Amino acid sequence: MNERLKEKLAVLPEQPGCYLMKDKHGTVIYVGKAKSLKARVRSYFTGTHDGKTQRLVEEIADFEYIVTSSNAEALILEMNLIKKHDPKYNVMLKDDKSYPFIKITAEKHPRLLITRKVKKDGGKYFGPYPNVQAANETKKLLDRLYPLRKCSTLPSRACLYYHMGQCLAPCVHPVSDEQNKAMVEQIVRFLNGGYEDVKRELAEKMHEAAETLEFERAKEYRDQIAAIEMTMEKQKMMLNDFIDRDVFGYAYDKGWMCVQVFFLRQGKLIERDVSIFPLYQDPDEEMLTFLGQFYAKAHHLKPKEVVLPSDIDGELARELLGVAVVQPKKGKKKELVELASKNAAIALKEKFYFIERDEERTIKAVERLGERLGIPAPRRIEAFDNSNIYGADPVSALVVFLDGKPAKKEYRKYKVKTVAGPNDYETMREVVRRRYTRVLKEGLPLPDLIIIDGGKGHLSAVRDVLENELGLDVPLAGLAKDEKHRTSELLAGDPPDVVPLDRQSQEFYLLQRIQDEVHRFAVMFHRKTRQKTMFHSVLDDIPGVGEKRKKALLNYFGSVKKMKEATVEELQRANIPRAVAEKIYEKLHE
């Protein structure tokens, strides 16, 4: 298990929710739900597992989670996340089934059905329900309590349901619209929360049956009450309408802000977006700025409705977005806003934890590096690297790390002036001389440690400049690479010798980061320098193309390749006269 996973496991909340396991490519490979995210997710990385689970665990490189308010809510969310991501390790919910809804049809003699598809057909839908068995039991209960028609087509004679008292038999007996309407209203009231009254009635009947020793009947009432309790759990993640809406929640602390967006489509939560950024103004103002930028992105289409916390200026938001903006004060929408805000607060807390851990770890790495080298903790480290191709366009780069973190404003680039050909030692001598001559002249801070990307020869050349030319006594170290161009050894001392380091230690990782960063910076600078050289040399012999037009062409096209792909008309767009553009085109296509 990598360090990142260990750290994320340490801050998991003991709350219900869903978790998404990801592989090294960031692909979601498994979605699960949990009563306690902390206990469930940790269980994957402790103890032994069967073959299938072990294969899953071996592929996990990262994970994320969404906190919910109940287990039922987590189950519904899990279903939607699985449908969205289609993870390869999820098998049970990979088909196109949905959890069931209870439906009252819009027919003249309405029926009560269990369906997995919601249509705009005038029917009344309730759900989806997180427990299939409970939904079926509730439907059976409603059938017994409210004797609506059962048959899909009216038969010529009364069926068994009529004789069981579960159907009024409109096939043979007149049933008025008022009777049907009254039953539908009672069912709607039941499913919308009036079930508590029914539970009380059933409880009374259960006690009466028990007193008269009708234990089977009492057991049936008890099971019906349990089924109601299982089914009627409220799911804040679901809204029983077809409106597409985005729900926003936010939290802020310590100069940072997190905004979480729940995307509800067709009444279902299908995705969420998490953004964490520095807070530069009042949170409510920052939220409005965020809204404008959020929907400016092409892949964020505006829904029919945006749901916002009540402390945001709703009128400004409506004017900004041009869609319906809702700021609920109660009900499911308010609970969704609160849930989004709760997840935002958790994400911020997690970020601060990692920041503190990273800072603590980085400082310790700096201190341990100093111990290994026998010097005080090198709070300021300056590192050099050269870059050239067979001596052409030689450059060098300097990066600065303060307390183990890159200080990019202090990075410097150097074009080599006095060295001809591929001479790495002399290049390093020139650049170090130029750097610290200026440092001394301008009274800039000296580093606590200088790191050279190179071996013993590089160290000897640099030490000669520092001590014999500039009179400086600054700790010096070299980083050697192996045949795969990876950090392999730390060299220090006079004469230079290998400093033993654990390759898994934080100080070794710090040196790797420094070496990778200075190499990246040097190579990027060399690439740009070489590109300019090639660009200018290609244009040198073309009449009418001076330095000003070379610069204009470089700024417009960026490379010889793109300029070569351009037509004469496109060349003219760089403020080049047509006659000159034709000459450039001919030269590039000789």
UniProtKB/Swiss-Prot annotation:
One of its GO terms (biological process) is SOS response. It holds the Pfam family UvrC_RNaseH. GO terms for cellular component: cytoplasm; excinuclease repair complex. Residues 196-231 form the UVR domain. GO terms for molecular function: DNA binding; excinuclease ABC activity. Keywords: Cytoplasm, DNA damage, DNA excision, DNA repair, Excision nuclease, SOS response. Residues 14-91 form the GIY-YIG domain. InterPro entries: GIY-YIG_endonuc, GIY-YIG_endonuc_sf, GIY-YIG_UvrC_Cho, RuvA_2-like, UVR_dom, UVR_dom_sf, UvrABC_protein_C, UvrC. It is found in: Cytoplasm. The UvrABC repair system catalyzes the recognition and processing of DNA lesions. UvrC both incises the 5' and 3' sides of the lesion. The N-terminal half is responsible for the 3' incision and the C-terminal half is responsible for the 5' incision. Belongs to the UvrC family. Interacts with UvrB in an incision complex. This is UvrABC system protein C. It comes from Geobacillus kaustophilus (strain HTA426).
